[in-house]
Amino acid sequence: MNTENKEITSNWFTNLRDLLCKEFEKIEEKYAQIKGLKPAKFVRTSWKRNGGGCGIMSLMKGEVFEKVGVNISTVFGEFSQEFRSEILGAELDGKFFATGISVVAHLKSPLIPAMHFNTRYIETSKNWFGGGGDLTPFYPEENETAKFHTAFKEACDKYDSSYYPKFKKQCDEYFYLRHRKEPRGVGGIFYDYLNSGNFEQDFAFTKDIGKALLSVYPEIVRSKLFLPWTAEQKEYQLIRRGRYVEFNLLYDRGTKFGLMTDGNVEAILMSLPPVVKFN
């Protein structure tokens, strides 16, 4: 396993965490200032993994972001015997290293889309990058969806013109609730097992995906910061959030990976909305 690669990827995810938290706090500060409220701040909680590694949860509950989490982790060790066959390159000795960032935002306003994003670097006897970002609006708007997709398409096109259509398709297929026969949101991109043979290029691409999120999602939130919404719209948001819960508990690979590697349960389930209704 390459020590330098592990260090620089882990450092980037920490840096991206800081940039995102700063941007989200600025949005809370602006809203609080105009409304005469005390702005919310991120609260950080560190955790250690028994088998090796650690992580930091950054969680904020405010007036704009009902719940937003920005988690980073770096873990290592050996996969359990039954899990090795499910992970690329882990079949022989089960050794692994994984570092990454996971971001989930649930907004108070039902007019502002929820957002999920993660990027990661994993080493076994193989090594690869994975991740992506997707948008879940409760009241979809074509221009907003196009803006989100364009940000990721531009990042993809810098490296390979085939990336965006391929990763968009993978996102649409992945974030699909098979038992309901419906998509979770309006998509984005999703990629896994990315290893072109050029580590520097794959890492640069993964960094640009993070920068794309940083450029587009805060802009979407700000554009709807002060739009009025109704109790009926809020009720609909709470019911649709149930789909988010269903997906994360039934299908999400990150949830399964975290639980199977003895990760921090609170960090793993950070993605769940704070309030949900099931009819």
UniProtKB/Swiss-Prot annotation:
Pfam families with a match to the protein in the record: Coprogen_oxidas
Active site as annotated: H116
Catalytic activity, as annotated: coproporphyrinogen III + O2 + 2 H(+) = protoporphyrinogen IX + 2 CO2 + 2 H2O
Site (Important for dimerization): H179
The UniProt record lists the keyword Transcription regulation: no
InterPro entries from the UniProt entry: Coprogen_oxidase_aer, Coprogen_oxidase_aer_sf, Coprogen_oxidase_CS
Record's GO cellular component terms: cytoplasm
EC number: 1.3.3.3
NCBIfam families: PRK05330.1
Protein name: Oxygen-dependent coproporphyrinogen-III oxidase
Organism field: Rickettsia prowazekii (strain Madrid E)
